[in-house]
C-alpha cells in the first residue's frame, strides 16, 4: 500500500504526515512513489500477482510531468526543499504538547528556528521559520 493511499488519498493528511516526518530527527527518506503522492497501482498488482507491486507504479515521463503539477506534490517539493536548506534542523528539537492531538515540534539554533504546529484531528498544520532577518511563514 502506498503511504498516500494508506491515508485515504487525502492531500491534507498526506502533507501533515510528511511534515511530521520532516520534523522528526534524522534524514527523511521518501520512496519515489511517495514523492509523487502515488496511489495504489491495483492494475499492476492484478497483472503481476506480486503483493509488493501495489506501491511500485512504473511512471512514464508524461505521467511524471503530469504528477509534478498536482498541488500536493508541489507542496511536498516545497516542504522537502525547506527541510534540506533550513539551518534550524542543525539545532535542537523541542516538543510542546498543546492539547490532545495537537503539538509543536521546534528545531532551533542560536540563529534561527523552524516550528511545526500540528492539529491531528483536523489534519491542519503550519510551519513558521524564524531567521535573523525576520519571520517567514512557510505553510
Task: Indicate where each model-derived feature is located.
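Active-site and adjacent substrate-binding regions of carbohydrate-active enzymes
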Residues: 1-139
